[in-house]
């Protein structure tokens, strides 16, 4: 960990009412003496002049001094709050850097120092960047929950449960004459199943948190001329796709990025799926399947004039069989303006079924509400936490090790192998909070932060 004293502008670049310069490190008190002529009382606002080396006033403002470890970074911290003109702030930073041992901070270095000094864990540090980058109220609330430790608490509870079970299993191994009795008495199996259930719940919440942060990818798929492009236009609120009566008009992937009550939604319109000898259309269909395989949800567009069915497997079994196993499906029966069907929303075989007219827009608002609910939209903004892809990957890895460990217990009564899988589970979970994390990963995470954070 660096021992340098770092400085950066904490407020956004450009013109503003107030501009803040943040200094952190052992030289913070030296900076105060050089720029202010005195060391402010700890944790008190001090209105004073900010002066250059010739004792000329650069600016006037408020100085705040926090003595480590009682500061954001855990080090001595000085904040200079002056006027928000960029020239003045640049002059002030230049003056601060005249003090020996002070350098410009790297992106995210203040948060990194806070992490290194155990002022926060890695999920909380990431939540700072996510709160700054939030594109919706729900994302901001979820990021704040993570910053306050909601996600961390869930992970710490899991790690503690896994650790306790691992200790129990290893104790059984230490008494080989009784090991089989320990492993088969049901206590270990019960504890393991409770951990798996808890992890499943955290995974579900984390997946929702990732969607809130990154947006949900929704692919509109179906046969040609089912109204996919009309639905894209209706959801986007503009003519993004060409719509004709000719089947196969859309031959490539069309993308629109919209917000529903601030929730980010990535809509993908795809080529109609059918057997064809047309080379260009075949390429479009291949791209359509590539998008489907990475989607969070599929809107299965059905031409309501061609069938009365609502069960997707009855409508097109080959299509359903090819979909990824855990991919969510929403059935959209289109052309209600022609069929005269009531604009209803029903559940059939575990799938939501919407009857709409993409052309006229009838029923589209209900579909939008459905998509918002899938993204985790809550009008009261309560609960939930933000999550990143790396968190999901670590949770998936932990789940995989637990399932392997369960097999070692139930099939082979192999205590040593179960203990090893529990150790690997513990490592995967601890990587989320940063207890066991490579320096390369830390560098990648913090380098994505703003300078001054």
From Swiss-Prot:
(6S)-5-formyl-5,6,7,8-tetrahydrofolate binds at residues 22, 79, 119, 453. Its cofactor is K(+). Its EC number is 3.6.-.-. K(+) binds at residues 225, 244, 246, 249. PROSITE patterns: G_TRME. It is an enzyme of class 3 (hydrolase). Mg(2+) binds at residues 229, 250. GO terms for molecular function: GTP binding; GTPase activity; metal ion binding. Homodimer. Heterotetramer of two MnmE and two MnmG subunits. It is found in: Cytoplasm. Keywords: Cytoplasm, GTP-binding, Hydrolase, Magnesium, Metal-binding, Nucleotide-binding, Potassium, tRNA processing. Belongs to the TRAFAC class TrmE-Era-EngA-EngB-Septin-like GTPase superfamily. TrmE GTPase family. This is tRNA modification GTPase MnmE. It comes from Shewanella woodyi (strain ATCC 51908 / MS32). GTP binds at residues 225-230, 244-250, 269-272, 334-337. Residues 215-376 form the TrmE-type G domain. It holds the Pfam family TrmE_N. The keyword Hydrolase applies. Exhibits a very high intrinsic GTPase hydrolysis rate. Involved in the addition of a carboxymethylaminomethyl (cmnm) group at the wobble position (U34) of certain tRNAs, forming tRNA-cmnm(5)s(2)U34. The keyword Phosphoprotein does not apply. GO terms for biological process: tRNA methylation; tRNA wobble uridine modification. One of its GO terms (cellular component) is cytosol.
